[in-house]
Amino acid sequence: MSKTVDFSTQLIIGGRPLPGSEGKTFETINPANGKVLASVAEASGEDVNKAVSVARKAFEEGPWSKMAPAERKKVLLRFATVIEAHAEELAMMEAMEAGKPITDCLEIDMPETVNTIRWHAEAIDKLYDQISPSDPSILSMIVREPMGVVAAILPWNFPAMMAAWKLGPILATGNTVVLKPAEQTSLSTIRIGELAAEAGIPDGVINVVCGFGETVGKALGEHPDVDCVAFTGSTETGRMFLRYSADTNLKRVLLECGGKNPFIVMGDTEDLDTAADHATNSIFWNMGENCSSNSRLLVHQSIKDELLELIVEKSKEWVVGDPLDAATKIGPMIEQAHLDKVMSFIDPVSYTHLTLPTKPCVG
């Protein structure tokens, strides 16, 4: 597999690549080496307005929202096939801009991205309305209709996969969308927007605006012509989108907010080796940058020493290295600020009682 890739860096509005209206750009950094990968077009408020307007026109006038379910299904299946054909390219982008191990990108993220689009495509002609019980002289129907224009706000930990989780149901039900990728990981989302056109998704159905949460994200959250916001990210930012909705048009807000879960091992656990396998996988996979990562380990005192010894040994199998190396299991964290936050949790100055079973690996 080639280790070179060309990056598209412009906004996608109405099926066209466009620079930001104010001419601003921001840098996407490779977290593995700190080098600039690309300068990405930064959307302004005017660009957000244009993207929403184009999405609104595409929704109201069709053809996507008015397309026969069987035809929409064909187009979405073709979209999945096009993404699949470019899986290596997208995997390279994600490894380079997010620091994700290339093996995970190829074997987990890209298949999940394709399968999500494909699953929702197959569901299109299997969605039925209902007839409710009523008087014989009355026909009472429950009809499901598309919502309209959806703003989809993506996180940086699974860029392509999260784009698919948003795009699948949004497109399958006839809506149009304005995608806002995380500023750390814009490149694969832009490319997916380009591939949508290749697959035959009509212009204006998928738009991509890049930039920062306090400007682009806020503009989408407050926009009066956005019917729904679908957000994945922090609880703090999720609350902001609820406020934006309350202060404007009461748009529907769908939140998937991050959280951390404890990994609990009871004293009567019979297979500690398997428990140690799961414990290491749950915290180290995807560098722990996962909303279901088990960042706390709650262990019964009677098995603590034995389990920790197993975990320390198994952690040695998690090779830290270049995300483009197929042998790497742990790449870099997304950015320096995030690394600093994680390292603060094991700061001996702040936690004087802390005893580390092994040395931190920071390069």
Where are these regions (language model features)?
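Single conserved hydrophobic/aromatic residue that forms the stacking wall/gate
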Residues: 351-363
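Rossmann-like NAD(P) dinucleotide-binding subdomain of oxidoreductase/dehydrogenase enzymes
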Residues: 128-274
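Glycine-rich loop-to-alpha-helix module at the N-terminal edge of alpha/beta enzyme cores
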Residues: 37-127
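Residue-level signal for inorganic ion chemistry
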Residues: 34, 72, 94, 174, ...
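Hydrophobic packing residues within well-ordered alpha-helices of enzyme cores
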Residues: 117, 189-192, 220, 241, ...
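ALDH superfamily catalytic-core signature
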Residues: 228, 236-354
